[in-house]
């Protein structure tokens, strides 16, 4: 998997940062895909500067209904429809996202020519496509807001073909059953348990993508042990009280969460427009002082998971 940041500003766009949107590129050899997390104003325009377009999107996850995370959605849906893409799309989000989509399409005389499914979520598992699971966590914000934890299922370990050949099993259809961990019966009556010839399973990758939030109990469960945590750092440590009062987090609080959750890497985003490049570097330094494995996202930054 890899993350492509389309917008990294909080509240309003700046000359160098658009409002929130993140692509998750699912780099699977047989079932690749592209998911979008939040869709602030101008998201479809930002996508024009990437290798992806709205027609490739399979799922969109909205954290909450504040405009800087949502106002780009109607235009993106309409453009996807005008392009003649017939592939289905599912939108996940809090209560009200269905009404928002229906109302904006109706009042603007717009529609979608592709199957559009809208799922209003609550805390808990919301998706398992056989390759990965998505769990929603309710966060602390003035509006109903969620963070999404995406975890790939573990991959089976490699089959020890050399040991199987030594046991008299020739490559062929039986290998597929053995690779699945099944027990097969050979022509001579012997039974071979595939699990005995498999290397340990390879742990799937995981990412936690937070919506806007002040520190809350659910945050630790959402982030616990993930390879990558994407979290807002709206304000610096000196403005922590102001951040929390508005349902946001400071640099210090975000980095402390990353450390306590034992994540592999923290990616900072949702930066207040008050910070210029020098100010952003100060935010990054504040996080790294607590959690060194921290990166600052810019628009069009790409990070592997």
Curated annotation (Swiss-Prot):
| Keyword Nuclease belongs to the record | yes
Which residues of the sequence carry a binding annotation for Zn(2+) 2? 68-69, 212, 270
Cofactor(s) named in the record: Zn(2+)
Q: Which top EC class applies here?
A: hydrolase
Q: Which UniProt keywords apply?
A: Endonuclease, Exonuclease, Hydrolase, Metal-binding, Nuclease, tRNA processing, Zinc
Residues that bind Zn(2+) 1, according to the entry?
A: 64, 66, 141, 212
Per the annotation, how and in what number is the cofactor bound?
A: Binds 2 Zn(2+) ions.
User: Where's the active site on this chain?
Assistant: 68 (proton acceptor)
EC number, as in UniProt: 3.1.-.-
Q: Under the GO molecular function aspect, what terms does this record hold?
A: 3'-tRNA processing endoribonuclease activity; exonuclease activity; zinc ion binding
Q: Which family does it belong to?
A: Belongs to the RNase Z family. RNase BN subfamily.
Which HAMAP family would you find in this protein's record?
Answer: RNase_Z_BN
Subunit structure, interactors included? Homodimer.
Q: What does this protein do?
A: Zinc phosphodiesterase, which has both exoribonuclease and endoribonuclease activities.
User: What is the protein name for this chain?
Assistant: Ribonuclease BN
Q: What is the lineage of its organism?
A: Bacteria, Pseudomonadati, Pseudomonadota, Gammaproteobacteria, Enterobacterales
């Amino acid at each position: 998997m890899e993350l492509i940041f389309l917008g990294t500003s909080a509240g309003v766009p700046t000359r160098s940062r658009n409002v929130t949107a993140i692509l998750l590129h699912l780099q699977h050899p047989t079932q690749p895909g592209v998911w979008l997390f939040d869709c602030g104003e101008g998201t479809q325009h930002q996508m024009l500067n990437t290798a992806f377009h709205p027609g490739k999107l399979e799922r969109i996850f909205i954290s909450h209904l504040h405009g800087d995370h949502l106002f780009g959605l109607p235009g993106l849906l309409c453009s996807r429809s005008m392009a003649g893409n017939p592939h289905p799309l599912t939108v996940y989000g809090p209560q009200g996202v269905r009404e928002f989509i229906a109302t904006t399409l109706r009042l603007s005389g717009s529609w979608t020519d592709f199957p559009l499914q809208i799922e209003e979520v609550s805390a808990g598992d919301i998706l398992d496509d056989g390759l990965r699971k998505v769990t929603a966590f309710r966060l602390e914000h003035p509006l109903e807001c969620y963070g999404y934890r995406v975890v790939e299922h573990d991959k089976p370990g490699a089959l020890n073909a050399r040991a199987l050949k030594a046991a008299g099993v020739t490559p062929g259809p039986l290998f597929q059953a053995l690779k699945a961990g099944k027990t097969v019966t050979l022509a001579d009556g012997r039974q071979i348990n595939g699990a005995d010839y498999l290397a340990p399973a390879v742990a799937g990758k995981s990412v936690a993508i937070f919506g806007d939030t002040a520190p809350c109990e659910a945050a630790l469960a959402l982030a616990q042990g993930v390879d990558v945590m994407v979290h807002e750092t709206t304000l610096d440590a000196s403005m922590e009280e102001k951040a929390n009062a508005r349902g946001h987090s400071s640099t210090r609080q975000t980095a402390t969460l990353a450390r306590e959750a034992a994540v592999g890497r923290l990616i900072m985003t949702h930066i207040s427009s008050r910070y210029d490049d020098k100010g952003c570097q100060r935010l990054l330094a504040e996080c790294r002082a607590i959690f060194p494995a921290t990166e600052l996202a810019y628009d069009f930054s790409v990070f592997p998971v």
